[in-house]
């Protein structure tokens, strides 16, 4: 059985750790509130913009949109993998990495050199570097600020690579935010744009195009893709903060349970020590009386 000094030291250590996890939980909760607010504002805008784009693509001559919508035989594939820069967020990054590797393994006909990864986030970067995957470029510290201008540059790089036929397909892999306790890995087509089905008559809208349909398409498609990538990063950021808050909450609760157990052990050890001292005093007194 450990002595009282060791138990007290362990109690102090666990208590200090609990204070840290509790503080991290509160910080993550504050960041989650902010990220969730941004995400809830963007989702309707992104959805509305996507609906407009689908209508325009469906009603526009294929020649105007073919560079973005035309399916190609896959000779080169780009995966945009979005992870976090920091850890202590449960299985958040592990799920992204696991699903990315599973998706890559589906392309049996492609050589490893035909699949490139664009990594956003240090955690995925560290993993894929060790595994010798082809990393075309990496971005870190984006999630901390999440400025649309920075995301726009990343999206432009991806679009240029696709339009120049460097890649035949681009996919996004990120965590979709459900709630603080639930995140889901999302595999989302980015390019080519999936050609929409015929819009329903209930949602039919006749648009007036100014100055022309061609100029609108030229502006609308890149903007929609930039918003799509920006939304994916917001989803990932909210998921990260939610996962970290949940993880730190569990760690704080576990520390409390461990403290209870250590305090019981401390009391038992102290009681045993006191009992032994009383027995020794009684034995000494009896010896003296004889």
UniProtKB/Swiss-Prot annotation:
Alphabetical keyword list? ATP synthesis, Cell inner membrane, Cell membrane, CF(1), Hydrogen ion transport, Ion transport, Membrane, Transport
Record GO terms (molecular function): ATP binding; proton-transporting ATP synthase activity, rotational mechanism
What's in the GO CC field? plasma membrane; proton-transporting ATP synthase complex
Its Gene Ontology biological processes? proton motive force-driven plasma membrane ATP synthesis
Give its localization: Cell inner membrane
Q: What Gene3D superfamilies does its record include?
A: 3.40.1380.10, ATP synthase, gamma subunit, helix hairpin domain (1.10.287.80)
Q: One short Pfam family name for this protein?
A: ATP-synt
| Annotated membrane topology | Peripheral membrane protein
Instruction: Just give the chief location class.
Output: membrane
Q: Which CDD domains match?
A: F1-ATPase_gamma (cd12151)
UniProt entry tagged with the keyword Electron transport = no
Under the heading HAMAP family, the entry gives: ATP_synth_gamma_bact
Quaternary structure and partners: F-type ATPases have 2 components, CF(1) - the catalytic core - and CF(0) - the membrane proton channel. CF(1) has five subunits: alpha(3), beta(3), gamma(1), delta(1), epsilon(1). CF(0) has three main subunits: a, b and c.
Q: Which family does the record claim for this protein? A: Belongs to the ATPase gamma chain family.
Biological role stated in the UniProt entry: Produces ATP from ADP in the presence of a proton gradient across the membrane. The gamma chain is believed to be important in regulating ATPase activity and the flow of protons through the CF(0) complex.
- The name this protein goes by in its record: ATP synthase gamma chain
Which organism is this entry from?
Amoebophilus asiaticus (strain 5a2)
Lineage per the UniProt record? Bacteria, Pseudomonadati, Bacteroidota, Cytophagia, Cytophagales
Question: What gene is this protein translated from?
Answer: atpG
């Amino acid at each position: 059985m450990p002595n009282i000094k060791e138990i007290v030291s362990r109690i102090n250590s666990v208590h200090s750790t609990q204070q840290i996890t509790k503080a991290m939980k509160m910080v993550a909760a504050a960041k989650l509130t902010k990220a969730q607010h941004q995400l809830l504002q963007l989702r309707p805008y992104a959805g509305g913009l996507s609906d407009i784009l689908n209508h325009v693509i469906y009603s526009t001559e294929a020649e105007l949109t073919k560079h973005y919508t035309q399916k190609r035989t896959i000779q080169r594939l780009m995966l945009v993998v979005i992870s976090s820069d920091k850890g202590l967020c449960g299985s958040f990054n592990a799920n992204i990495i696991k699903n990315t590797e599973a998706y890559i393994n589906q392309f049996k006909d492609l050589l490893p050199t035909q699949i490139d990864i664009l990594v956003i986030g240090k955690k995925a970067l560290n993993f894929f570097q060790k595994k010798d995957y082809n990393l075309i470029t990496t971005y870190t510290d984006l999630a901390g600020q999440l400025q649309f201008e920075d995301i726009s540059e990343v999206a432009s790089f991806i679009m240029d690579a696709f339009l120049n036929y460097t890649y035949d397909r681009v996919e996004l892999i990120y965590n979709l935010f459900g709630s603080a306790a639930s995140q889901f890995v999302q595999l989302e087509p980015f390019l080519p744009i999936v050609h929409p089905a015929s819009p329903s008559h209930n949602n039919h809208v006749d648009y007036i195009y100014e100055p022309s349909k061609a100029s609108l398409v030229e502006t609308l498609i890149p903007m929609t893709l930039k918003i799509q990538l920006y939304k994916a990063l917001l989803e990932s950021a909210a998921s990260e903060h939610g996962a970290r808050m949940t993880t730190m909450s569990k760690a704080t609760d576990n520390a409390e349970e461990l403290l209870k157990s250590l305090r019981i052990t401390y009391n038992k050890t102290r009681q045993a020590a006191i009992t032994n001292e009383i027995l020794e005093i009684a034995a000494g007194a009896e010896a003296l009386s004889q």
